[in-house]
Amino acid sequence: EKLTLNMLYAGGSFGRRSNASSDYVVEAARIAAALPGTPVKLVWTREDDMAGGYYRPTVLHKVRAGIDGKGAVVGWDHVMVGKSIMIGTAFETMIVKDGVDATTVEGASDTPYALPAYRFEVHNAREGVPVLWWRSVGHSHTGFAVESFVDELAHAAKQDPLAYRRALLPAGSR
């Protein structure tokens, strides 16, 4: 069958457009094949979009740290388990290095804080749930995990959370 596909070039490649296996293209082609000579415009309803779209990856963070008598961090250990959004895609060779998806770990593997005895470990979960990004990638979950834990440390040290964060920043930070 001969079909002409007119794509709207707009924005980035987010949502369904970011995945080579997106089924909306096949759906539009099948409709067009059933209606020869008739232009077809496929628009999913919000409900179809939610049911047919991919999911945001579930991520588990386990963060531990040690503080001294003055509340200063003396060691930081962060383990993260989650499914990569890039492994298995055309972007894998560009973004995944040594098995680590940079978009998944951003904000945890490179915190703005000067943390002594810092250790970060990531494990890529393998399960059958299809995942993609939703408005953000790593920072959406790593920011919450890191900053919530810094709040816990400030509380344990009986210090103001903002002052505690400022003390964790490297000298000369803005």
Segments (PLM) and residue ranges:
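Structural alpha/beta core scaffold segments of enzyme domains
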Residues: 1-174
